């Protein structure tokens, strides 16, 4: 067996992508539906099925309350931070424990980590199908501006999915890695502008001789393509109410229809000046059914979303300032994320940096490609690349007077370790409470609490005498570890920051076991679907051959074939795999016998009956059904050579 691969996964808000190094080059892997991107959507059906990706998206309108999309906007966050998101989703978001978040469905309650794990399992299976071997290791990307809790939650999702997360890397950094992979001899300063489905990041990097050094990063984890969709949705709801007097925002299935229509309109307005939004039978009143029929122009869309586009300006300016650079110092601006296709976004980028953005990378795939390259570095497949990332936010502790004392400043290269000695604030103080903070504000209360722990057993002494050394250690994943040590006694207390919205080790282990059981059920379900498709293909072929053969076969043979087709269809309805396999063997024999007889008499259709063994065709049928209604467009973003920009 070949050496185990470390795959790269872009776990996106809207879509996810998986890539792997093959023969020294990164390869984006198609999923079982034949698409290179997989919707980050999980659904639970009335039949007890768990659907992931395009299958989940296809049934979202009729099963809105049990279809979870944009889980990434909730991962690692506290319930009080999610009020805006909760207003615009079709499913129910509830409190978990003290401050955590869960999604309530007919199949039970699930954390954002568990939902994300289902998507990661789909990515894992996609890679295993392609490689023909088991995959257990991955590099997973996160927005650069994700805080410690969000990073830890993403890593937990990977564990639940059965993956050993070798590294968490920032999405803009991964994009830069992909862009510069074949430009190792080029020395340049680049800006990566990443506007995805739920988050915005801007990173400034310096590329020199295979070293990718992040100089600064900034962003907004509450801004992305979902917000542009919401702006259109709110406009549709308001316009419809003005026209009819009816508020259509209360019905969950209607909200799901509005969401899909808004997303479609947004995409169309990237290539046309106006779009028609038509939703028949959107609601009804005493006078009868009502239809939504509106025209949205690009000018109106730009007006609705101007504040969202403008929100990306200040992070860009801050990132340039933190890097000690002017816009004119930037050699290339790389655009990442589906939302960068919006013309107003591209125009703003041009205004900020004073140059046309570089469009030589695929904005949907470039992050996963960079993750695969980093996986290649960790696996020893790539040797001439060094990645130096940074921590996006400052870290410190609360000190006397409620002030935040910073130990590690934002944009410090990671991994890093920093210690500082503190003392007691009162005479004979026997314990100190360490309040760990992340943020940029001066007062502790204005920053984010990552955790608290106590160092006890300090010998009685006047205030200011004990020496308490506090050490912050940020690993290569950007995850924080903190320790406090009494230098007088040697007593030490260490913690890995575990958020109030996070998961305990016991909870993670339980979820891992649940996910393993879920994977087994998924495999069984997939085998049943494949058996159905194969048997249905055989039944259809036999039926077609008999109809075309006419009097080339006798009445008894026709009746035998008709009975066998009926038994096959009954087996398909039963969902019993063993019964379907038995029917498949029986119908294959009859099809072969009839085909031989018809062929010997030169009748049409014989070759089809004889050759329809089923498995490949059945798999294709399954894939096609999964792609039903989906517009998979790989070429809507022009890829050009650098010299042809």
From Swiss-Prot:
Gene3D superfamilies: 1.20.1270.10, 3.30.420.40, Actin, Chain A, domain 4, Substrate Binding Domain Of DNAk, Chain A, domain 1. It comes from the Bacteria. Induction: By stress conditions e.g. heat shock. InterPro entries: ATPase_NBD, Chaperone_DnaK, Heat_shock_70_CS, HSP70_C_sf, HSP70_peptide-bd_sf, Hsp_70_fam. Residues 616-629 have a biased composition (Low complexity). SUPFAM superfamilies: Actin-like ATPase domain, Heat shock protein 70kD (HSP70), C-terminal subdomain, Heat shock protein 70kD (HSP70), peptide-binding domain. Disulfide bonds: none annotated. The modification Phosphothreonine is found at residue 199. NCBIfam families: PRK00290.1, PRK05183.1, prok_dnaK. Belongs to the heat shock protein 70 family. Acts as a chaperone. This is Chaperone protein DnaK. It comes from Leptospira borgpetersenii serovar Hardjo-bovis (strain JB197). The gene is dnaK.
């Amino acid at each position: 067996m070949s050496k185990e691969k470390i795959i790269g996964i872009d776990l996106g808000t809207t879509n996810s992508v998986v890539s792997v190094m093959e023969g020294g080059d990164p390869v984006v892997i198609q999923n079982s539906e034949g698409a290179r991107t997989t919707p980050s959507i999980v659904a639970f059906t009335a039949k007890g099925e768990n659907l992931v990706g395009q299958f989940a998206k296809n049934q979202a309108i009729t099963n809105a309350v049990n279809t979870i999309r944009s889980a990434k906007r909730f991962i690692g966050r506290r319930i009080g931070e999610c009020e805006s998101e909760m207003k615009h989703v079709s499913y129910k978001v509830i409190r978990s424990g003290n401050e955590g978040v869960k999604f309530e469905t007919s199949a039970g309650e699930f954390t954002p980590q568990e939902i994300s794990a289902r998507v990661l399992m789909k990515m894992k299976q996609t890679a295993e199908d392609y490689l023909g071997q088991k995959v257990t290791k991955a590099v997973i990307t996160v927005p650069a501006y994700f805080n410690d809790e969000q990073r830890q939650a993403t890593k937990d999702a990977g564990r639940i999915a059965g993956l050993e997360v070798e590294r968490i890397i920032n999405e803009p950094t991964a994009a830069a890695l992909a862009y510069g992979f074949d430009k190792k001899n080029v020395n340049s300063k680049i800006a990566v502008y990443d506007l995805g489905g739920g988050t915005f990041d801007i990173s400034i990097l310096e590329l020199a001789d295979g070293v990718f050094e992040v100089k600064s990063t900034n962003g907004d984890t509450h801004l992305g393509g979902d917000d542009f969709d919401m702006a259109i949705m709110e406009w549709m709801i308001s316009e419809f109410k003005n026209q009819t007097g009816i508020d259509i925002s209360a019905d969950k299935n209607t909200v799901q229809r509005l969401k899909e229509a808004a997303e479609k309109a947004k995409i169309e307005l990237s290539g046309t000046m106006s779009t028609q939004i038509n939703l028949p039978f959107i609601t009804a009143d005493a006078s009868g059914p009502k239809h939504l029929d509106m025209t949205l122009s690009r000018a109106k869309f730009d007006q609705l979303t101007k504040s969202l586009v403008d929100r990306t300006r200040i992070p860009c300016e801050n990132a340039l300032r933190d890097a000690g650079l002017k816009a004119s110092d930037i050699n290339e601006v790389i655009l990442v994320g589906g939302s960068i296709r919006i013309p107003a976004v591209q125009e703003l980028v041009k205004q900020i940096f004073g140059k046309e953005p570089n469009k030589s990378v695929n904005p949907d795939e470039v992050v996963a490609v960079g993750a695969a390259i980093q996986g290649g570095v960790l696996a020893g497949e790539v040797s001439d690349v060094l990645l130096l990332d940074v921590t996006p936010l400052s870290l410190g502790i609360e000190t006397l007077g409620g002030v935040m004392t910073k130990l590690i400043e934002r944009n410090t290269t990671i991994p890093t370790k920093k210690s500082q000695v503190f003392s007691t604030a009162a005479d004979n103080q026997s314990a100190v409470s360490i309040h760990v903070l992340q943020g940029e504000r001066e007062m502790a209360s204005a920053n984010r609490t990552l955790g608290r722990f106590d160092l006890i057993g300090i010998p009685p002494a006047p205030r200011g005498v004990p020496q308490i050394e506090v050490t912050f250690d940020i690993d290569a994943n950007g995850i924080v570890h903190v320790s406090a040590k009494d230098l007088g006694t040697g007593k030490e207390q260490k913690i890995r920051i575990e958020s109030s919205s996070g998961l305990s080790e016991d909870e993670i282990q339980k979820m891992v076991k649940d996910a393993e059981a879920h994977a087994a059920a998924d495999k069984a379900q997939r085998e049943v679907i494949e058996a159905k498709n194969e048997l249905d293909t055989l039944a259809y072929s036999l039926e077609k051959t008999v109809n075309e053969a006419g009097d080339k076969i006798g009445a008894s043979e026709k009746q035998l074939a008709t009975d066998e087709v009926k038994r096959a269809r009954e087996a398909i309805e039963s969902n019993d795999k063993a019964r379907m396999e038995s029917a498949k063997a029986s119908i294959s024999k009859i099809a072969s016998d009839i085909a031989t007889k018809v062929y010997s008499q030169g009748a049409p259709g014989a070759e089809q009956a004889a050759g329809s063994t089923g498995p490949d065709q059945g798999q294709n049928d399954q894939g096609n059904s999964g792609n039903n209604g989906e517009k998979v467009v790989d070429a809507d973003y022009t890829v050009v050579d650098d010299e042809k920009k």
